Amino acid sequence: MRLITKMFLAACCSLVVATPALGQNTDAESVDKQSTQEETKTMPKPEQFLGKCVGKWQGTVKTWFEPGKLVDESKVSGEIVSLLNGNFFRHTYEGSMKGKPRHGEETLAMNGITKKFQICWFDDFHMSGAILISEGDSIERGFSVSGKYDWAPGKPQGGWRTDYELKDSDHLTITAYNIMPNGEEAKAVETVYERVKEYPINSPSQSSPSNQP
């Protein structure tokens, strides 16, 4: 796998708290508590997370070749589908990078024994005929997985961390970080998705023409 500027080229080419009177609860506290409870209810359990991501998505993807230096921002479209009775999921996407077409695919799963998330990823821009295998744990709104890749013969491997986060049911962010051999991290790729709303079967735009004049 190539790093930008060697390592980066292969990877990316990557209180203020008001105290109420004793024994009293402010309206704001009640609202915050209710909001937190509602948010907790809507968050999918780790084993349900991938299923909540199924659907068609569109948005933007940003790429950094070096820390803090944004080199590309472009449109991206993707789809996540369920495979083999929901035991596996496939994420396919297409977009562009500096005007050139870019395509990629991920196979995702949650290991039923270890309860860890696992991803197998390949991409026609970031890879050099290699497959990146990553594994990790759930986080508050999704999961975070890490893997290693080769960027030059005889050199220490680089690391790659990917975070999947559902902001809500219609907004998914996938952020990848390049990890140098010394442990330093830098944001490499950020995909911000919005769910594509598809017409319901019985919507007026797809219903049969009226028989009445």
Task: Give the role of each language-model region.
Residues 9-18:
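Bacterial N-terminal signal peptides
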Residues 1, 13-14, 28:
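Low-complexity, intrinsically disordered short peptide segments enriched in small/polar/basic residues
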Residues 24-213:
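Hydrophobic small-molecule pocket/channel-lining residues, especially in calycin-type beta-barrels
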Residues 1-9:
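Bacterial N-terminal signal peptides that target proteins for export
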Residues 19-23:
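Sec/Tat signal peptide C-region and signal peptidase I cleavage site
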